[in-house]
Protein backbone atom coordinates (compact mmCIF):
# COMPACT_ATOMS: atom_id res chain seq x y z
CA UNK A 1 0.00 0.00 0.00
CA UNK A 2 1.46 3.36 -1.04
CA UNK A 3 2.34 5.65 1.86
CA UNK A 4 0.45 8.91 2.30
CA UNK A 5 1.70 12.23 0.89
CA UNK A 6 0.29 14.65 3.44
CA UNK A 7 1.84 17.68 1.72
CA UNK A 8 0.01 16.92 -1.54
CA UNK A 9 -3.27 16.51 0.32
CA UNK A 10 -2.84 19.81 2.14
CA UNK A 11 -1.99 21.69 -1.05
CA UNK A 12 -5.06 20.27 -2.78
CA UNK A 13 -7.31 21.24 0.12
CA UNK A 14 -6.02 24.81 0.23
CA UNK A 15 -6.53 25.18 -3.53
CA UNK A 16 -10.01 23.65 -3.27
CA UNK A 17 -11.02 26.16 -0.61
CA UNK A 18 -9.82 29.04 -2.79
CA UNK A 19 -11.53 27.72 -5.93
CA UNK A 20 -14.89 27.07 -4.25
CA UNK A 21 -14.90 30.53 -2.67
CA UNK A 22 -14.18 32.10 -6.07
CA UNK A 23 -17.03 30.14 -7.68
CA UNK A 24 -19.47 31.13 -4.93
CA UNK A 25 -18.50 34.80 -5.15
CA UNK A 26 -19.12 34.69 -8.88
CA UNK A 27 -22.52 33.09 -8.35
CA UNK A 28 -23.51 35.63 -5.70
CA UNK A 29 -22.35 38.59 -7.74
CA UNK A 30 -22.14 41.04 -4.82
CA UNK A 31 -20.64 39.77 -1.57
CA UNK A 32 -17.14 38.46 -1.01
CA UNK A 33 -15.56 36.11 1.50
CA UNK A 34 -13.73 37.43 4.54
CA UNK A 35 -10.84 35.23 5.65
CA UNK A 36 -9.69 34.67 9.22
CA UNK A 37 -6.74 32.46 10.11
CA UNK A 38 -6.49 30.81 13.50
CA UNK A 39 -4.06 28.69 15.50
CA UNK A 40 -4.81 25.82 17.84
CA UNK A 41 -2.82 25.63 21.07
CA UNK A 42 -2.48 21.84 20.89
CA UNK A 43 -1.13 22.01 17.34
CA UNK A 44 -2.22 23.17 13.91
CA UNK A 45 -4.79 25.71 12.85
CA UNK A 46 -6.75 26.77 9.82
CA UNK A 47 -8.44 29.47 7.80
CA UNK A 48 -12.16 30.20 7.91
CA UNK A 49 -13.72 32.08 5.01
CA UNK A 50 -17.23 33.42 5.47
CA UNK A 51 -19.54 35.34 3.14
CA UNK A 52 -22.53 37.05 4.74
CA UNK A 53 -25.57 39.01 3.54
CA UNK A 54 -24.92 38.42 -0.13
CA UNK A 55 -27.36 38.82 -2.97
CA UNK A 56 -27.97 35.06 -3.13
CA UNK A 57 -26.26 33.68 -0.04
CA UNK A 58 -27.37 34.73 3.43
CA UNK A 59 -24.29 32.99 4.75
CA UNK A 60 -21.68 30.72 3.21
CA UNK A 61 -18.74 29.35 5.15
CA UNK A 62 -15.78 27.46 3.67
CA UNK A 63 -13.35 26.28 6.32
CA UNK A 64 -9.89 24.73 6.01
CA UNK A 65 -8.34 23.13 9.08
CA UNK A 66 -5.19 21.17 9.78
CA UNK A 67 -5.00 20.05 13.39
CA UNK A 68 -2.79 17.70 15.40
CA UNK A 69 -3.22 16.11 18.80
CA UNK A 70 -1.63 13.68 21.23
CA UNK A 71 -4.69 11.45 21.62
CA UNK A 72 -7.63 10.59 19.39
CA UNK A 73 -10.94 12.06 20.62
CA UNK A 74 -13.89 9.85 21.49
CA UNK A 75 -15.84 10.90 18.38
CA UNK A 76 -13.08 9.51 16.15
CA UNK A 77 -12.62 6.20 17.98
CA UNK A 78 -16.25 5.33 18.71
CA UNK A 79 -16.42 3.06 15.66
CA UNK A 80 -12.66 2.24 15.67
CA UNK A 81 -11.71 1.55 19.31
CA UNK A 82 -8.36 0.05 18.26
CA UNK A 83 -7.17 3.59 17.49
CA UNK A 84 -7.76 4.91 21.00
CA UNK A 85 -4.65 6.51 22.48
CA UNK A 86 -2.94 7.18 19.16
CA UNK A 87 -1.77 10.65 18.22
CA UNK A 88 -3.53 12.12 15.20
CA UNK A 89 -3.29 14.59 12.35
CA UNK A 90 -6.44 15.70 10.55
CA UNK A 91 -6.96 18.10 7.67
CA UNK A 92 -9.96 18.98 5.58
CA UNK A 93 -12.24 21.48 3.90
CA UNK A 94 -15.80 21.78 5.16
CA UNK A 95 -18.49 24.10 3.86
CA UNK A 96 -22.13 24.98 4.40
CA UNK A 97 -24.18 27.38 2.27
CA UNK A 98 -27.43 28.95 3.48
CA UNK A 99 -29.12 30.86 0.62
CA UNK A 100 -31.56 33.74 1.03
CA UNK A 101 -34.04 32.32 -1.47
CA UNK A 102 -36.03 29.35 -0.13
CA UNK A 103 -36.09 27.89 -3.65
CA UNK A 104 -32.30 27.48 -3.57
CA UNK A 105 -31.33 24.51 -1.38
CA UNK A 106 -28.95 24.64 1.53
CA UNK A 107 -25.93 22.46 0.92
CA UNK A 108 -22.97 20.97 2.77
CA UNK A 109 -19.73 19.42 1.56
CA UNK A 110 -16.65 18.07 3.26
CA UNK A 111 -13.44 16.30 2.26
CA UNK A 112 -10.91 15.24 4.86
CA UNK A 113 -7.78 13.21 5.53
CA UNK A 114 -6.80 11.58 8.81
CA UNK A 115 -3.67 9.86 10.15
CA UNK A 116 -3.44 8.09 13.50
CA UNK A 117 0.08 7.25 14.70
CA UNK A 118 1.67 5.16 17.43
CA UNK A 119 5.33 4.50 18.16
CA UNK A 120 6.42 1.13 16.87
CA UNK A 121 3.39 0.73 14.60
CA UNK A 122 2.54 1.73 11.05
CA UNK A 123 0.39 4.85 10.77
CA UNK A 124 -3.29 4.29 10.03
CA UNK A 125 -4.68 6.77 7.50
CA UNK A 126 -7.93 7.28 5.65
CA UNK A 127 -9.97 9.73 3.62
CA UNK A 128 -13.58 10.76 4.14
CA UNK A 129 -16.09 13.26 2.90
CA UNK A 130 -19.07 13.80 0.65
CA UNK A 131 -21.76 16.32 -0.18
CA UNK A 132 -25.48 16.54 0.47
CA UNK A 133 -28.40 18.77 -0.52
CA UNK A 134 -31.16 20.13 1.71
CA UNK A 135 -33.99 21.69 -0.32
CA UNK A 136 -36.93 23.52 1.22
CA UNK A 137 -39.00 23.67 -1.96
CA UNK A 138 -37.54 20.81 -4.01
CA UNK A 139 -37.60 20.48 -7.78
CA UNK A 140 -37.17 16.95 -9.08
CA UNK A 141 -34.96 18.28 -11.90
CA UNK A 142 -32.51 19.60 -9.30
CA UNK A 143 -32.47 16.41 -7.26
CA UNK A 144 -31.88 14.30 -10.37
CA UNK A 145 -29.06 16.50 -11.67
CA UNK A 146 -27.44 16.52 -8.21
CA UNK A 147 -27.43 12.73 -8.04
CA UNK A 148 -26.40 12.34 -11.68
CA UNK A 149 -23.32 14.47 -11.07
CA UNK A 150 -22.54 12.36 -8.00
CA UNK A 151 -22.96 9.14 -9.97
CA UNK A 152 -20.82 10.42 -12.85
CA UNK A 153 -17.87 11.34 -10.63
CA UNK A 154 -18.05 7.94 -8.92
CA UNK A 155 -18.23 5.95 -12.17
CA UNK A 156 -14.46 5.78 -12.92
CA UNK A 157 -13.90 4.21 -9.50
CA UNK A 158 -16.34 1.32 -9.96
CA UNK A 159 -20.03 0.76 -10.55
CA UNK A 160 -20.62 -0.13 -6.90
CA UNK A 161 -19.23 3.17 -5.57
CA UNK A 162 -22.19 5.52 -6.14
CA UNK A 163 -24.88 3.17 -4.73
CA UNK A 164 -22.72 2.41 -1.68
CA UNK A 165 -21.90 6.02 -0.81
CA UNK A 166 -25.37 7.27 -1.74
CA UNK A 167 -26.90 4.84 0.78
CA UNK A 168 -24.30 5.79 3.39
CA UNK A 169 -25.31 9.43 2.92
CA UNK A 170 -29.01 8.60 3.34
CA UNK A 171 -28.22 6.63 6.50
CA UNK A 172 -25.87 9.23 7.98
CA UNK A 173 -27.95 12.37 7.41
CA UNK A 174 -31.01 10.95 9.15
CA UNK A 175 -32.75 12.41 12.19
CA UNK A 176 -34.14 9.47 14.21
CA UNK A 177 -36.17 11.72 16.51
CA UNK A 178 -37.93 13.19 13.44
CA UNK A 179 -37.93 9.99 11.38
CA UNK A 180 -36.81 11.91 8.30
CA UNK A 181 -33.67 12.52 6.29
CA UNK A 182 -32.01 15.92 6.54
CA UNK A 183 -32.46 16.39 2.81
CA UNK A 184 -32.22 14.46 -0.45
CA UNK A 185 -28.74 13.09 0.18
CA UNK A 186 -25.77 12.81 -2.13
CA UNK A 187 -22.54 11.04 -1.19
CA UNK A 188 -20.90 10.14 2.11
CA UNK A 189 -17.75 8.07 2.58
CA UNK A 190 -15.29 7.42 5.38
CA UNK A 191 -12.40 5.09 6.28
CA UNK A 192 -11.30 5.08 2.62
CA UNK A 193 -7.84 3.50 2.20
CA UNK A 194 -8.36 0.01 0.78
CA UNK A 195 -7.28 0.93 -2.78
CA UNK A 196 -4.04 2.57 -1.65
CA UNK A 197 -3.14 6.21 -1.26
CA UNK A 198 -3.16 7.41 -4.88
CA UNK A 199 -6.54 5.93 -5.77
CA UNK A 200 -8.13 7.01 -2.49
CA UNK A 201 -6.74 10.54 -2.88
CA UNK A 202 -8.04 10.65 -6.47
CA UNK A 203 -11.55 9.83 -5.29
CA UNK A 204 -11.42 12.48 -2.57
CA UNK A 205 -10.32 15.02 -5.21
CA UNK A 206 -13.18 13.99 -7.50
CA UNK A 207 -15.71 14.55 -4.72
CA UNK A 208 -14.20 17.89 -3.72
CA UNK A 209 -14.11 19.20 -7.28
CA UNK A 210 -17.48 17.68 -8.17
CA UNK A 211 -19.35 19.57 -5.47
CA UNK A 212 -19.52 22.94 -7.21
CA UNK A 213 -20.30 21.22 -10.53
CA UNK A 214 -23.35 19.71 -8.85
CA UNK A 215 -24.50 22.81 -6.94
CA UNK A 216 -23.89 25.77 -9.26
CA UNK A 217 -26.44 24.74 -11.94
CA UNK A 218 -29.16 24.45 -9.28
CA UNK A 219 -28.40 27.95 -8.00
CA UNK A 220 -28.52 29.32 -11.54
CA UNK A 221 -31.89 27.68 -12.22
CA UNK A 222 -33.57 28.95 -9.04
CA UNK A 223 -31.95 32.30 -8.21
CA UNK A 224 -34.52 34.42 -10.07
CA UNK A 225 -37.61 32.78 -8.55
CA UNK A 226 -39.62 35.21 -6.42
CA UNK A 227 -40.76 34.25 -2.93
CA UNK A 228 -42.81 35.72 -0.11
CA UNK A 229 -43.00 35.70 3.67
CA UNK A 230 -44.77 32.32 3.70
CA UNK A 231 -41.87 30.61 1.92
CA UNK A 232 -39.33 32.43 4.06
CA UNK A 233 -40.97 31.30 7.29
CA UNK A 234 -41.05 27.69 6.11
CA UNK A 235 -37.37 27.92 5.18
CA UNK A 236 -36.51 29.22 8.66
CA UNK A 237 -38.55 26.44 10.28
CA UNK A 238 -36.85 23.73 8.21
CA UNK A 239 -33.43 25.18 9.02
CA UNK A 240 -34.13 23.99 12.54
CA UNK A 241 -33.54 20.44 11.34
CA UNK A 242 -30.04 21.47 10.28
CA UNK A 243 -29.30 22.74 13.77
CA UNK A 244 -30.75 19.64 15.41
CA UNK A 245 -28.66 17.30 13.28
CA UNK A 246 -25.39 19.18 13.59
CA UNK A 247 -25.54 19.60 17.36
CA UNK A 248 -26.88 16.14 18.21
CA UNK A 249 -25.54 13.70 15.61
CA UNK A 250 -22.82 15.12 13.38
CA UNK A 251 -19.45 13.44 13.98
CA UNK A 252 -17.50 16.34 12.49
CA UNK A 253 -19.08 18.86 14.86
CA UNK A 254 -18.47 16.58 17.84
CA UNK A 255 -14.88 15.94 16.74
CA UNK A 256 -14.17 19.66 16.50
CA UNK A 257 -15.63 20.41 19.90
CA UNK A 258 -13.93 17.43 21.58
CA UNK A 259 -10.50 18.35 20.18
CA UNK A 260 -10.65 21.96 21.32
CA UNK A 261 -11.11 23.28 17.81
CA UNK A 262 -12.07 26.85 17.02
CA UNK A 263 -15.71 27.13 18.08
CA UNK A 264 -16.61 29.88 15.61
CA UNK A 265 -15.33 27.75 12.74
CA UNK A 266 -17.03 24.59 13.98
CA UNK A 267 -20.39 26.32 14.37
CA UNK A 268 -20.02 28.14 11.06
CA UNK A 269 -22.50 25.58 9.71
CA UNK A 270 -25.31 27.06 11.79
CA UNK A 271 -27.87 29.12 9.83
CA UNK A 272 -27.85 32.84 10.73
CA UNK A 273 -31.61 32.79 11.32
CA UNK A 274 -33.79 29.84 12.33
CA UNK A 275 -37.08 29.23 14.09
CA UNK A 276 -39.00 26.43 15.77
CA UNK A 277 -42.76 26.09 15.96
CA UNK A 278 -44.57 23.76 18.32
CA UNK A 279 -46.58 21.05 16.59
CA UNK A 280 -46.13 22.35 13.05
CA UNK A 281 -47.60 20.26 10.25
CA UNK A 282 -47.82 21.43 6.63
CA UNK A 283 -51.24 21.87 5.04
CA UNK A 284 -52.53 18.78 3.26
CA UNK A 285 -51.84 18.88 -0.46
CA UNK A 286 -49.39 21.79 -0.15
CA UNK A 287 -45.93 21.98 -1.70
CA UNK A 288 -44.60 22.00 1.86
CA UNK A 289 -46.36 18.68 2.52
CA UNK A 290 -44.79 17.25 -0.64
CA UNK A 291 -41.34 17.84 0.86
CA UNK A 292 -42.20 15.53 3.76
CA UNK A 293 -44.19 12.97 1.79
CA UNK A 294 -41.90 12.58 -1.21
CA UNK A 295 -38.45 14.03 -0.71
CA UNK A 296 -37.44 13.29 2.90
CA UNK A 297 -37.46 9.54 2.28
CA UNK A 298 -34.47 7.67 0.84
CA UNK A 299 -35.08 6.52 -2.72
CA UNK A 300 -33.33 5.66 -5.97
CA UNK A 301 -33.48 9.06 -7.67
CA UNK A 302 -31.68 8.02 -10.83
CA UNK A 303 -34.33 5.40 -11.59
CA UNK A 304 -36.75 8.31 -11.92
CA UNK A 305 -34.65 10.18 -14.48
From Swiss-Prot:
It holds the Pfam family Coprogen_oxidas. SUPFAM superfamilies: Coproporphyrinogen III oxidase. One of its GO terms (biological process) is protoporphyrinogen IX biosynthetic process. The active site is at 108 (proton donor). One of its GO terms (molecular function) is metal ion binding. One of its GO terms (cellular component) is cytoplasm. The record marks 177 as: Important for dimerization. Belongs to the aerobic coproporphyrinogen-III oxidase family. This is Oxygen-dependent coproporphyrinogen-III oxidase. It comes from Shewanella denitrificans (strain OS217 / ATCC BAA-1090 / DSM 15013). The gene is hemF.
Amino acid sequence: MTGPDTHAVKQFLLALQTNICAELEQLDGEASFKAESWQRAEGGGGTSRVLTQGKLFEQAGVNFSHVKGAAMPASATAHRPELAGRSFEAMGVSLVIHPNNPYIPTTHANVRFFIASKEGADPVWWFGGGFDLTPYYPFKEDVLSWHQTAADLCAPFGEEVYPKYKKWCDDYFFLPHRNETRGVGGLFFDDLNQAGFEQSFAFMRAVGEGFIQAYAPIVERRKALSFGEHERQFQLYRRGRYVEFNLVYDRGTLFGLQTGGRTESILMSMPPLVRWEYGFTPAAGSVEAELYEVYLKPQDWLQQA
